Amino acid sequence: MNVGLLAISGIRVVDEELLRLGLTLPGFVERSETIASLPSLGLLTLAALTPPQHEVHYLEVPDPRALVELPNGLDLVAISSYSAQIREAYDLADRYRAAGIPVVMGGPHVSAVPEEAIEHCDAVVVGEGEPCWNQVLADCEDGRMAGVYDARPFDYDLSDAPVPAFELLDISHYNRLTVQASRGCPHRCE
């Protein structure tokens, strides 16, 4: 199965329209360009967890609005999204679904409002993706995606995570790479 992991740059403060409207803070544009240029560690970790019988494609989508043609040849598309770009992520998911390609979505926004996200995809991952990723792949292969994969409560030990699949990146496109030492908030708020 050909699996596409789509990373959407998270901060759009370099968007010409936003800048024209004056929606910026001094220095924030420069910092946001750096943040937006970082690869998705979550998706790269899922790539590292993907069994070898699947072919993984990590695709950076800097601006889904400018994407005229969808990357094709994929049997499953996984999109991780923050709230800042969720509408663009939904539009991209809708386009893939219209092309008949199953879509699974995850990330902080999707975990917060899965009932909203499921309207745009075949399955959502609530919580961390690592514990259920292989089940998502198996279910997609069998043509029976569960709809909601709930990986809560958070009990994933980051020390069990493989090294993210940095080999999928063209390192020359990034001015830095990040390392995870911890993840999420340690408090268990209701």
Name every feature range the model reports, one short phrase each.
Residues 1-190:
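Acidic, low-complexity intrinsically disordered segments
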